[in-house]
């Protein structure tokens, strides 16, 4: 009878230690995709800011006279 509680305790201790393969795969994909996504966001920001500045600067200059 002593073996059953010991077995249950060992099972509870071992289960969180085992990595979830799906979670590990998703985490590795996110780590790999992180820098690429950051570069894409930066490129989009540069393009958008360039477009806005090319539109807004002439408008502001026209308003100032």
Curated annotation (Swiss-Prot):
Q: PTM Lysine amide: list the residues.
A: 64
Q: Propeptide residue numbers?
A: 20-43
Which portions of this protein are annotated as coiled-coil regions? Answer: none
Compartmental location: Secreted
Annotated signal peptide: 1-19
Task: Name any GO cellular component annotation.
Answer: extracellular region
Expressed, tissue-wise, as follows: Expressed by the venom duct.
Q: Which UniProt keywords apply?
A: Amidation, Cleavage on pair of basic residues, Neurotoxin, Secreted, Signal, Toxin
Single GO MF descriptor: toxin activity
State where it is primarily located. secreted
Q: Which family does it belong to?
A: Belongs to the conotoxin T superfamily.
What more does the entry say?
The mature peptide does not contain cysteine residue.
- Protein known as: Conotoxin VnMLCL-01
Q: What is the lineage of its organism?
A: Eukaryota, Metazoa, Spiralia, Lophotrochozoa, Mollusca
């Amino acid at each position: 009878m002593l073996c059953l509680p010991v077995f249950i305790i060992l099972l509870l201790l071992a289960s969180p230690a085992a990595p979830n393969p799906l979670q590990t795969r998703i985490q590795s994909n996110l780590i790999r995709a992180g820098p690429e996504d950051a570069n894409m966001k930066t490129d989009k920001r540069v393009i958008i800011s360039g477009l806005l500045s090319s539109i807004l600067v002439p408008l502001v200059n026209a308003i100032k006279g």
